[in-house]
């Protein structure tokens, strides 16, 4: 039985050092619980709605330095977290350093690389560009990266093999919108499901809107029941401002079984830490 801890931390937008302090505490708490793995939300180190901070090189270098700190803290536990990845050798459309909305994993004090991966992180595939979301303004998607590398998305989107004690879990790591694929021409979940994965892990920075959680339960329940793969969903909480509107993030971390049934859900806007027991055959 694999113990997977989650933490829906109260992310402070733009304050990497304070977010690191929270993350460091959660790593220690997960150790004390005997967890094999800790899963944290999307953009938990930097915040999500931080506007043109994404264009400040000093901020990006600080982000890189603290990603290294998280990796170093994984000496006896696997850690999966959402953060910004930077490729200083490439640029985006505005000639600024290329950035990815990414998921990192580390174990034994070192970064892990997805199966057949070209980077030591997972790149978000579907970048939202509506309401409060500005992903396409700042980040490069896996779709664009694959196109430039001459790869199909099926080749570029690969499982993450994550150590968990004496076992290894073959996971499909998703970043928020990657599971909200109803209005897209492709489904990252469907692609990963064909690659013999045992568990989906969705790292999210999903603001609260009325009825959104109910829609997520319906949407994921339908998708997972068809793919026959369970999921753990981890969302951040707190308050963030995109310069136009303030948005609350309610957490509501959840687990779904392979039938798509919601089997556990954290309380909204609170600090509950969940410990899920996962068995690949159940």
Task: Please give the residue ranges for each predicted region.
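Enzyme catalytic cores with a strong preference for nitrogen-chemistry domains
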Residues: 1-282
């Amino acid at each position: 039985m694999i113990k997977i801890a989650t933490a829906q931390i109260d992310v402070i937008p733009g304050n990497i050092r304070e977010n690191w302090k929270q993350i460091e505490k959660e790593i220690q708490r997960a150790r004390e619980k005997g967890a094999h793995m800790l899963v944290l939300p999307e953009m938990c180190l930097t915040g999500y709605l931080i506007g043109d901070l994404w264009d400040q090189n000093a901020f990006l270098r600080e982000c890189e330095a603290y990603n290294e700190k998280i990796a170093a803290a994984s000496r006896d536990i696997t850690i999966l977290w959402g953060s910004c990845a930077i490729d200083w050798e490439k640029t985006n459309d505005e000639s600024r350093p290329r950035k990815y909305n990414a998921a990192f994993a580390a174990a034994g004090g070192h970064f892990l690389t997805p199966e057949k991966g070209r980077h030591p992180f997972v790149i978000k595939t579907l970048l939202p560009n509506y309401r409060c979301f500005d992903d396409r303004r700042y980040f490069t998607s896996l779709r664009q990266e694959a196109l430039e590398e001459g790869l199909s998305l099926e080749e570029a989107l690969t499982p993450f093999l994550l150590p968990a004690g004496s076992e290894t879990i073959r996971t499909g790591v998703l970043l928020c919108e990657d599971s909200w694929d109803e209005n897209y021409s492709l489904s990252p979940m469907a692609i990963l499901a064909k690659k013999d994965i045992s568990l989906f892990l969705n790292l999210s920075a999903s603001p609260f809107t009325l009825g959104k959680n109910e829609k997520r339960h319906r949407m994921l329940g339908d998708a997972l029941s068809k793919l026959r793969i369970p999921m753990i969903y981890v969302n951040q909480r707190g308050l963030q401002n995109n310069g136009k509107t303030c948005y609350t993030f309610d957490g509501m971390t959840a687990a779904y079984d392979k039938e798509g049934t919601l089997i556990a859900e954290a309380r909204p806007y609170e600090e509950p830490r969940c410990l899920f027991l996962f068995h690949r055959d159940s």
